[in-house]
Amino acid sequence: MTFQIMTDSTADLSPYYIKKHHLTVLGMTVTVGEETYETIGEAALDNSTLLAAIKKGATVHTSQINSGQFLEVFKKFASADEELLYLAFSSGLSGTYQSALIAQDMVLEEFPSAKITVVDTLAAASGEGFLVEETVKLRDSGKSLTETLEVLSDIIPRLQSRFMVDDLNHLARGGRIPKAVALVGTMANIKPLLDVDPEGRLRQVTKVRGKKKAINQLLEKSLEEMDTAYPRLLISYSGTDEIAQEIKKQAMQKKGISDVDVRPLSPTIVTHTGDGTIAIFSISRKSRE
């Protein structure tokens, strides 16, 4: 391998994929009531436990990865003289990216020739995972880190993240969206559709009456703007996968789509979205506006 790849637990990557491609993944922690859980490894919190606690009214929150955790991992790669690329959770949603930059500076003081590169994906959930997977493809095809970074600088601004959340109050409580947006979502049968803006922050793009219409609009917009050089969709969900599988079925009937993958959102993300979330990720022809 030409370089090592690292990301965090928000990327919705399966343990199988992480192991198969030799990825390093750091996990944020999730606190449910008075109990704090890991989100990576055999003892990781699962979504069914988390959603059951949320349904019962438990207070839940996440804690970002701190600079000390990054420092420990970065030093391991630096001391082994290995080249590392860390793809970080959006700086518009968490301080994790800044923590990584602090750790990077500290490592360079001790190992001036360390090859540690930190990239802000400006993405979350399977959008971040999408970028990790494209990075893996590039690395495994023999591309250098420099060549890979050139591709990432092109596709990161064009990554589209569109989603619908059943209960926006979870995002509002975590400060991810304004409370006024969440209030609209409580109105009868009104579904605000959200995306991730160019700075990696969540925003409302429109309001649709009815869940089915909202989901159809998510899919249609993703397909309409898709770059045919990246003919794939990632569909993520919280709770049951019934709706996500139906979206996949619809998408696979469209001309030009070669790959549609359905996967659960990670507990780190579900903590902020709750049950009933549907998200669609794709690479668009144009940059986010």
From Swiss-Prot:
Binding-site residues, hexadecanoate: T62, S94
Annotated PROSITE patterns: DEGV
Keyword Aminoacyl-tRNA synthetase: no
Entry-linked Pfam families: DegV
Keywords from the UniProt entry: Lipid-binding
The keyword Cell wall biogenesis/degradation belongs to this UniProt entry's keyword annotation: no
GO molecular function: lipid binding
InterPro entries: DegV (IPR003797), DegV_C (IPR043168), DegV_domain_contain (IPR050270)
Domain DegV residues, every copy: 3-284
Function according to Swiss-Prot or TrEMBL: May bind long-chain fatty acids, such as palmitate, and may play a role in lipid transport or fatty acid metabolism.
Protein name (record): DegV domain-containing protein YteA
